[in-house]
Amino acid sequence: MRTGLGYDLHRLVRGKKLMMGGVHIPFKKGEKAHSDGDVLLHAITDALLGACGMGDIGEFFPPSDKKWKDANSSELLSTVWERISEAGWKIQNIDCVIIIEEPKILPFREEIRKSIAGILKIEKEQIFIKAKTGEGIGIIGRGKAVAALASCLIFCRHTQE
């Protein structure tokens, strides 16, 4: 068994969509990023890559490569997970924290869990999501950014049989 930890942060700006776990969250601002800016999927991707010792999201999808401009983060995670699972890894669970001042994430939590489960082809009961605010402190607390943390526990299916 191995654990991985992922983190991502993006500024929030007007005129962009707010994407969270592959779900569009209606809001006046969205993530400013090279891809679609889905901080939650980016954090999960980094957690999985770290657990497998396969680097990080920037190595797989460098922002300097125009091919990844406005890329769908669901597709990025799916691509990475396909490679990891081909190497024999399975997910035990993924635990996430979204840090955002507004909007409230709770009304979207189950849809986000379903979306992530669909991307990774696992049960939504293996995915846990919590949301916190910045308590008015710092760039997140002022509503100018969003961040996400994700941890994962994976195991090699060859050692479980």
From Swiss-Prot:
Residue positions binding 4-CDP-2-C-methyl-D-erythritol 2-phosphate: 8-10, 34-35, 56-58, 142
Lineage: superkingdom: Bacteria
Annotated cofactor note: Binds 1 divalent metal cation per subunit.
Assigned EC number: 4.6.1.12
Record key words, sorted: Isoprene biosynthesis, Lyase, Metal-binding
InterPro entries, A to Z: MECDP_synthase, MECDP_synthase_CS, MECDP_synthase_sf
Binding-site residues for a divalent metal cation, renumbered to this chain: 8, 10, 42
Enzyme kind, highest EC tier: lyase
GO MF annotations in UniProt: 2-C-methyl-D-erythritol 2,4-cyclodiphosphate synthase activity; metal ion binding
GO biological process, one term: terpenoid biosynthetic process
Enzymatic reactions: 4-CDP-2-C-methyl-D-erythritol 2-phosphate = 2-C-methyl-D-erythritol 2,4-cyclic diphosphate + CMP
Site entry: Transition state stabilizer: 34, 133
Pathway annotation from the record: Isoprenoid biosynthesis; isopentenyl diphosphate biosynthesis via DXP pathway; isopentenyl diphosphate from 1-deoxy-D-xylulose 5-phosphate: step 4/6
Cofactor: a divalent metal cation
NCBIfam families named among the record's database cross-references: ispF
The protein's assembly and partners: Homotrimer.
Described function: Involved in the biosynthesis of isopentenyl diphosphate (IPP) and dimethylallyl diphosphate (DMAPP), two major building blocks of isoprenoid compounds. Catalyzes the conversion of 4-diphosphocytidyl-2-C-methyl-D-erythritol 2-phosphate (CDP-ME2P) to 2-C-methyl-D-erythritol 2,4-cyclodiphosphate (ME-CPP) with a corresponding release of cytidine 5-monophosphate (CMP).
HAMAP family xrefs: IspF
Family designation: Belongs to the IspF family.
Protein name: 2-C-methyl-D-erythritol 2,4-cyclodiphosphate synthase
Species of the source: Treponema denticola (strain ATCC 35405 / DSM 14222 / CIP 103919 / JCM 8153 / KCTC 15104)
Gene behind this protein: ispF
